[in-house]
Amino acid sequence: MIKKILVANRGEIAMRIFRTCRVMDISTVAVYTHVDRGALHVRYAEEAYCISNSPEDTSYLKPELILAIAKKTGAAIHPGYGFLSENADFARRCEEEGVIFIGPGADIIAKMGIKTEARKIMREAGLPIVPGTETPVQGIEEVKKVAKEVGYPIMVSSINSIYPLVSDSRTL
């Protein structure tokens, strides 16, 4: 059983995890930036470590520091939402260094980061998915063909991002 969790996140996301930990009698570790030093999640955690004097949120993306603190404190790492939660390399580093990563394994994170692969995995698992393609479309004509099959509106998406909602074939 996990006895201590470092939350590699901030604000309300960290607080939700910390509250759950308290109910489950699990010790908590916060990481924070200089700007967040007075934040509720920092005060609420049983231990707190400053990872940067930078005001930027990118400080929460410093895997070396977060791993070092997790090892020092003997904590598992909960990435929360965003930041490191979708970083397969970070999850893999945790695995390699013997630190428990609370979340999907690195291979799953990597696969779910590729939209067409994610759709395939979800379909095979019997999960409901919105109509679309499981292979990348090649050009506007193929997009129009898919749109005709599934109906408008559609969301046109690259593998790593999403483009605006398309209401009809004229806006393609």
Describe these PLM feature segments.
Residues 1-172:
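N-terminal beta-alpha lobe that positions the nucleotide/phosphoryl donor
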